[in-house]
Regions:
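Catalytic histidine neighborhood in serine/cysteine hydrolases
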Residues: 172, 176-193
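Active-site loop/oxyanion-hole signature of alpha/beta-hydrolase fold enzymes
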Residues: 13-14, 27-67
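Conserved HGGG/HGGXW glycine-rich cap/lid loop of the alpha/beta-hydrolase fold
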Residues: 1-35
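Active-site nucleophile elbow and catalytic-triad environment of alpha/beta-hydrolase enzymes
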Residues: 133-149, 155
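Conserved alpha/beta-hydrolase "acid-adjacent" motif
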Residues: 166-171
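Catalytic active-site module of serine/aspartate enzymes centered on a nucleophile-bearing elbow/loop
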Residues: 189-221
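Short beta-strand/loop motif that positions the catalytic acidic residue
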Residues: 153, 159-161
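Flexible "cap/lid" loop of the alpha/beta hydrolase fold
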Residues: 74-82, 88-118
Length: 221
């Protein structure tokens, strides 16, 4: 399980107990977040995907079912592209593959642009402030995954968003359309936190996807 920007494994408090009854759950704080430190000046999703692959190697796990939320969904997608042998199936909720306004709900990116313009020349005085800006810049500049690059993903994927998500439905649909073996689930009456707002349904649906013998290219109503 891979959490979102600025989060930690606590993001999955509504999900880990369910999945732990059937799976060996692996959850770690991503670098520069939660209890994990990162002294470097910048972050990339590619590096974070490599971290996840290295974690599996360290634990002597050949491949895993991967669930990612928000930035964690981006990391999951990068993991499937960079280390295809590590991913059995992938479920990503609230993920984007471009950092510009086209990926987000109307007006949302404009607020981030104002924040960027206000803070881009600031000199941060503390490690906490520098780390917070590093995480902001991660999402401001990244990801930059061309839609046609998603054609390389070989594993079955469940692409998820809420119908009131931060990520636009149109962007989510384009991700789904460009992955060869993918299913799409737009969660009704949900914002970005699909896995929290609709935890029971989310857990059962993702579990069903992971445990099904085959994956079909279809949209879940």
């Amino acid at each position: 399980m891979i959490h979102g920007n600025g989060g930690s494994i606590r993001a999955f408090s509504h999900n880990i107990p369910y999945f732990a009854t059937k799976y060996h759950v692996i959850a770690a704080d991503s670098r520069a977040q939660g209890k994990s430190k990162d002294p470097g000046p910048t972050l990339t999703f590619e590096t974070m995907a490599d971290d996840e692959a290295a974690l599996l190697d360290t634990l002597h796990i050949k491949a895993a079912y991967v669930l990612g939320w928000s930035d964690g969904g981006i990391v999951a997608i990068e993991l499937a592209m960079r280390h295809p042998d590590k991913v059995i199936k992938l479920a990503a909720t609230g993920a984007n593959v471009q950092p510009d306004a086209s990926a987000f709900r109307p007006g949302l990116w404009d607020g981030w642009k104002k924040q960027y313009d206000a803070d881009k020349n600031k000199i941060w005085k503390t490690d906490e402030e520098r780390n917070r800006w590093k995480l902001f810049m991660l999402d401001w500049n990244q990801p930059n995954i061309p839609f046609d690059a998603l054609h390389a993903i070989a594993c079955p994927c469940l692409i998820i968003c809420g119908d009131h998500d931060l990520i636009s439905i149109e962007h989510t649909v384009k991700i789904f359309q460009n992955i060869p073996n993918a299913e799409l689930w737009v969660v009704p009456s949900s914002g970005h936190a699909t896995l929290i707002q609709h935890a029971d349904e989310f857990n059962k649906t993702v579990d069903e996807f992971f445990s099904s013998p085959t994956s079909r290219r279809a949209s879940k109503p």
